[in-house]
């Protein structure tokens, strides 16, 4: 329970960035939903003190998100290493790596698990699924506009039963399957792909769904085919990476059953065409969408959405929804109409071409993964064992599998030998991590530059063995892993948290001989002193 006064007091005491605010107040260290508000309060208090509020994304880049986008686009930069070597410093962090990954995807739309891009991906984008509190993942196949055939429903049901997945219908008119272990994801998706499904991008800062009513095809009140348009929009914009997630909806009449006026892009049918609404939002701070244009034909509607979305991608801040973007846009909706509808900057055709390249280069990330044996090898809980994670336990509730409350399990036995050969060095992705077993103990191996580190795999403060799936980076030059669930920054050399707290992670000695990674069975006991 952190108040505005607590944040203001922290700023008065010298906390000048989000890392410092999180460390001394613990604000925005839970679900992260309040991060934008905390940042706004911090910046307001800094400005009240006469302190210049910098828009630098983090310590590694003295640039705003908009500036990074233009650096990437204008200079044809295709990798994080190219960008940081020319315009940044250090090794990156949990802020700049996903940000740059998103910008690169928005510009060039390359496969996220290419070796140059994999280290930038947070766990959801790295494994193309949404991580849950116990370290398992949820799977969401695409159902454009909520349409699904009887055979498709049967296939989903059979897959859920076969892999003991909890099934739930989402607010976006599709089905979410919970509880998939990391190593099960490829098999689940191979069956889904065989049944005609593709990824629903529920894990990405991208288009989620285009919700719709049944429209004029079935409904006596419908005046246009809302489902048909929603299917077209969803297939056009699927996979589009943006500063934040994008939700759309299409209603077939003014009764508004699809709730289009609460979406980033909303479309409502009229007798003459379609009304376009923009920058609506539900969630923590609801915002009613603005009427942007009326009675558009379908071609003009799509052209307007193309331009608006690409302009949003160019100009929004990091993790800024369209609703907040609009509220902070000088000139508001009138200015946006000038840019998009009247082409006041003369960039309309350019924005359309950028969108066309994204549409033309679409790929189902899971289909690409299933066709690549090297990428499939990354989808395993342990690089040297097929044994499943013993911490993942289930019981039945309301006829479905549910996670058991977390309990402390006895730690696995360590090997009797002083050193255990774990894997080949090349089995650990560069600048990333992978899970392993030291005897029966779960550990995380990290390949940072030319060194390999080993820590316990349990994320502090959780019951999930997921630390190996965290991002690697540095804090003031100190190599760290950023935990995937709660974004805790943990030093690689000794397992100590960088942001305060005394709950350390055990570290284990590592050596690399003839391309083989060995881990010692005697943990590193002493806390390493800061150099």
Feature locations, PLM:
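Local cysteine-cluster metal-coordination motifs and their immediate loop/turn environment
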Residues: 1-8, 22-43, 54-65, 88-101, ...
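Small-residue-enriched alpha-helical segments and adjacent helix-cap loops
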Residues: 37, 59, 137-275, 291, ...
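Flexible, glycine/charged-enriched surface loops at secondary-structure junctions
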Residues: 80-82, 98, 112-116, 165-171, ...
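Short flanking/linker segments adjacent to small metal-binding domains or redox-active Cys/His motifs
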Residues: 33-47, 82, 88-106, 307-331, ...
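Mobile "lid/hinge" segments at catalytic clefts and subdomain interfaces of large enzymes
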Residues: 252, 256, 261-320, 335
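Short Fe-S-cluster ligation motifs
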Residues: 17-41, 54-76, 87, 128, ...
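Rieske [2Fe-2S] iron-sulfur-binding domain
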Residues: 427-531
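C-terminal accessory/binding modules appended to enzymatic or scaffolding proteins
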Residues: 1-18, 51-80, 133-135, 151-156
């Amino acid at each position: 329970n952190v108040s505005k006064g607590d944040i203001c007091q922290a700023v008065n005491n010298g906390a000048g960035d989000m890392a410092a605010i999180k460390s001394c107040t613990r604000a925005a260290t839970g679900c992260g939903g309040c991060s934008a508000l905390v940042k706004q309060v911090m910046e307001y208090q800094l400005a009240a003190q006469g302190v210049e509020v910098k828009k630098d994304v983090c310590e590694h880049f003295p640039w705003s998100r908009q500036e990074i986008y233009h650096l990437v686009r204008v200079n044809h930069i295709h990798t994080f290493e190219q960008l940081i070597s020319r315009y940044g410093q250090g090794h990156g962090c949990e802020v700049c790596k996903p940000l740059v990954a998103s910008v690169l995807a928005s510009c060039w739309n390359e496969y996220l698990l290419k070796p140059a891009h994999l280290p930038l991906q947070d766990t959801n984008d790295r494994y193309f699924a949404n991580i849950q509190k116990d370290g398992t993942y949820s799977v969401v196949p695409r159902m454009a506009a909520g349409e699904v055939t009887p055979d498709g429903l049967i296939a989903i049901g059979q897959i859920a039963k076969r892999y003991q997945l909890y099934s739930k219908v989402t607010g976006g008119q599709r089905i979410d399957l919970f509880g998939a272990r990391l190593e099960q994801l490829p098999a689940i998706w191979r069956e889904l792909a065989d049944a005609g499904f593709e990824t629903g991008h529920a894990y990405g800062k991208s288009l989620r769904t285009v919700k719709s009513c049944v429209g004029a095809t079935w409904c006596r009140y419908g005046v246009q085919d809302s489902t048909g348009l929603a299917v077209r929009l969803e297939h056009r914009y699927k996979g589009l990476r943006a500063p934040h997630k994008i939700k759309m909806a299409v209603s077939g009449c003014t009764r508004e059953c699809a709730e289009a006026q609460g979406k980033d892009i909303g479309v409502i049918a009229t007798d003459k065409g379609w009304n376009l609404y923009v920058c609506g939002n539900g969630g923590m701070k609801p915002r009613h969408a603005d009427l942007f244009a009326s009675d558009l034909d379908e071609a003009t509607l799509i052209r307007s959405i193309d331009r608006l979305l690409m302009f949003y991608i160019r100009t929004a801040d990091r993790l800024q929804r369209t609703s907040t973007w609009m509220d902070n846009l000088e000139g508001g909706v009138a200015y946006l109409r000038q840019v998009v509808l009247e082409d006041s900057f003369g960039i309309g055709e350019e924005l359309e071409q950028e969108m066309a390249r994204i549409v033309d280069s679409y790929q189902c990330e899971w289909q690409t993964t299933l066709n690549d044996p090297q990428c499939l090898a990354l989808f395993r809980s342990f690089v040297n064992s097929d044994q499943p994670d013993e911490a993942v336990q289930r019981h039945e509730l309301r006829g479905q599998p549910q996670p058991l409350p977390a309990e402390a399990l006895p730690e696995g036995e360590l090997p009797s030998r002083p050193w255990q050969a774990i894997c080949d060095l090349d089995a650990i992705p560069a600048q990333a991590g992978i899970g392993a077993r030291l005897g029966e103990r779960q550990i995380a191996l990290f390949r940072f530059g030319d060194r390999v580190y080993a820590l316990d795999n349990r994320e502090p403060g959780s019951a999930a063995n997921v630390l190996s799936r965290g991002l690697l980076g540095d804090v003031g030059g100190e190599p760290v892993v950023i935990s995937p669930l709660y974004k805790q920054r943990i030093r690689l050399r000794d397992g100590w948290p960088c942001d305060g707290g005394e709950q350390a992670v055990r570290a284990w000695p590592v050596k690399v001989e003839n391309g083989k990674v060995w881990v010692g069975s005697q943990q590193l006991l002493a806390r390493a002193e800061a150099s």
